[in-house]
Amino acid sequence: MDDSTHAAEAVIATPAGNRTVRFETGRLARQAAGSAVAYLGDTMVLSATTVSKQPKEQLDFFPLTVDVEERMYAAGRIPGSFFRREGRPSEDAILTCRLIDRPLRPSFAKGLRNEIQVVATVLALDPDTLYDVVAINAASASTTLSGLPFTGPIGATRVGYVDGEWIAFPTHAELARATFDMVVAGRVVEDGSDVAIMMVEAEATPGTVELIAGGAPAPTEEVVAAGLEAAKPAIRELCRAQSELASLAGKAATREFPVFIDHHDDVLEALSAAVGDELSAALRIAGKSERENELDRVRQLAAEKVAAQFEGREKEIGAAYRALTKKLVRSRIVTEGVRIDGRSTTEIRELSAEVDYIPRVHGSALFERGETQILGVTTLAMLRMEQTVDTLNPDRTKRYMHNYNFPPYSTGETGRVGSPKRREIGHGALAERALLPVLPSREEFPYAIRQVSEALGSNGSTSMGSVCASTLSLLNAGVPLKAPVAGIAMGLVHADDAYVTLTDILGAEDAYGDMDFKVAGTRDFVTALQLDTKLDGIPASVLASALQQARGARLAILDVMAEAIGSPDEMSAHAPRVISVKIPVDKIGEVIGPKGKMINQIQADSGAEITVEDDGTIYIGAADGTSAETARSAINAIANPQMPEVGERYLGTIVKITNFGAFVSLTPGRDGLLHVSKLKTLSGGKRVEKVEDVLTVGQKLQVEITEIDARGKISLSPSAEAADAAAAS
């Protein structure tokens, strides 16, 4: 490849106007095996692909690593961390890593064991665009230029469903009017006749329900399938531009890399003859535990029978055994339409749903689908507890936080327990996106919400189980969801140009199948979906059929969930009570007071926590409703006051004593003067020389308004009750 700069453009026509993605190579990162810069507007992403010189022969997997580096200077900002520099990757960066990895990984030659690293660095960010799809295209371009055995290029586009039309590469403003947001990656098939879909990541938007209520079309299965088709022209154009760039740059011929075959045919044939029948019988055992115990026995028997014949090739025996297992599982599905546990291709495992499972927490639920078991737990808090995020994303806070935990015991294994891995972050983000469209607004439900999904047992799609458990838990916590959401994972087996779609896949079907297609939604529309495939691509028509098959399963799951809880429960007695009050913006300063004196006093007197928003909305949180109402009354007395009248009585607090009397606080921000001459009734009718002899600061005293002058100054006298109490003492 020469050192001059080369460029190619992809121009994508959309109903909102043309979008241009520009690719460049030859100027930056020249020492990488392949490097490319992709532009969308002012967004600029540099991707560099490198490869190790020697293979890692001991590995039994493909060592591909994808990293995304968010540089805060891209948005003209300094990192908010203590050291003021970028640290560990943000959640957005990790999710973008996964978006890049998923279509790239199946596109490399099988058996490759050289370490490959793709690093995408965000150098500039246009405030109108998201960088994730730009990074996918940049990564594909740099890998295409690297000379690696790669079946790309891969094109990726975001399409938004806005006003009944699919728009490629929508801006933030357009996404705000969209009912569905979808990232689609794919490649042009060898004969150029079609675009095969390799990866999909999609969700309804937070405003979807309101937009539908306003007349916008809902993102049904048919609409989503049309979106996959709408993405194809953009993907084709992006692939064309990347191929043009490679041609202009004089891309080197694909280099030779050693490919390590897991096993040779003679080992597979020997194993098939030795234990094929026993393995086939073991795979027909429905229960996971019993099946795996028998499979372990057959695996050991297989090793004993062929070990002597293939001495020194033990690794091949293990790989061949896995290949034989995969072959038998897939063959039975295709020929008999029967799966490992005896179900048909459209059958769902036994379902169970239970709410209010854990004491004292604000909301909880246990959802089970076969051997997959998810515990959902909801915690509510004041809005000040929402998460602050320091990323390139324009949203700086997260009110709804979904955490997913996958402990090793969920699969009966030992392992590391600690900070979440990329997979856990990805699963939590998927469940979060599935539920965001049905969450109430801040005004409707002024709480920060943390949802935790504990995968206690795993045998297929814990992420979709998390969606179901979370819906149940949120309703149990009293969160007024706009609609319940359920999810299901679909699988695929491809053989001889036939595609068999599987509903509710097991872990083994995920491992031995060709697709993991997760679909979540309400009864009326899809809220989230995610596609991963091990194939070079899947026809959009197959995915459209899988969407329809998933809908039937989703409705069945929603019926079971509705039996457990059909509407939001009363909030837990242990959850905080949050109410809101609106005040004029010019009264905010009075409520806060000098150096926070007034608001701190209200919090101390009421026991409530108070958060003041810039628009005059005040959120009041307390352990009980009485404390919250006390704080609200105090705030209203300052910001939305009713003028006191002569003759009204108050239980006031002595706040200041002078030589001429005492100042009494009637309500926050409103004091009156109790003159020394009025204190006779508190001292048996005798003249009071020193106010301190009768009153003390902080003392509560029943007083009555005797006069309000033209300037609003209030004069007080002790009420008859106060005089009687003084006489009795």
Swiss-Prot record:
Single GO term (MF): polyribonucleotide nucleotidyltransferase activity
One cellular-component annotation, GO: cytosol
Subcellular localization, as worded in the UniProt entry: Cytoplasm
RNA-binding in keyword set: yes
Top-rank EC class of the record's enzyme: transferase
One family name in Pfam for this protein: S1
Required co-factors: Mg(2+)
Transmembrane segments: none
Top-level division of the source organism's lineage: Bacteria
Translocase recorded as keyword: no
Main location: cytoplasm
InterPro entries, per the entry: ExoRNase_PH_dom1, ExoRNase_PH_dom2_sf, GPSI/PNP, KH_dom, KH_dom_type_1, KH_dom_type_1_sf, NA-bd_OB-fold, PNPase
Residue ranges of every copy of the S1 motif domain listed in the record: 647-719
Residues covered by the KH domain: 576-635
Paired cysteines (S-S): none
Enzyme Commission designation: 2.7.7.8
Record family assignment: Belongs to the polyribonucleotide nucleotidyltransferase family.
Function: Involved in mRNA degradation. Catalyzes the phosphorolysis of single-stranded polyribonucleotides processively in the 3'- to 5'-direction.
UniProt name for this protein: Polyribonucleotide nucleotidyltransferase
Source organism of this protein record: Frankia alni (strain DSM 45986 / CECT 9034 / ACN14a)
Source organism phylogeny: Bacteria, Bacillati, Actinomycetota, Actinomycetes, Frankiales
